Amino acid sequence: MNLQGNPLSAGAGTLRAGGFTWAYATSPTPLSRDYLIRIEMACDASPRVFVDDPDIGLLAGGRDLPHIYRNPTRLCLYLPGTREWQPWLRLDQTIVPWTSLWLFYFEDWLESGEWKGGGMHPGEASRTRQGRRRLGIRRPDECEIGNEE
């Protein structure tokens, strides 16, 4: 992983027993606000991505946030269990750009009220990875909204 060397994710991190935390500032477009992002990675676990600033719940103005996990609030960037993300994949080439894409669609949702980033919502029939491939759909941000991955 080359988080420091990638201009999209240049920031600072903390290494600890069993994992690390990485924080960086990003903006999905030149006209967008800046976001402070934190990635937490633990051994044998999927990365967890948080927006530390600004408060996306406050930005939503009381509306339910789309495509997040709760407790604690973190971004849903891909559909767990489909192997769209694997521990051997580089965070700077997967999670970082997927986070920018999520933020792009989030800002659009703030204005339009419609989530255009794709993905799965609770209650929808689960699509398999093979089914999505057969349909030509490969979205990094597909997820089911829930408490845990």
Residue ranges with predicted function:
Residues 1-21:
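Charge-rich, low-complexity N-terminal segments
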Residues 14-80, 89-90:
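Compact alpha/beta protein-protein interaction domains typified by the UBC
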Residues 53-149:
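Domain-scale recognition of soluble eukaryotic interaction modules
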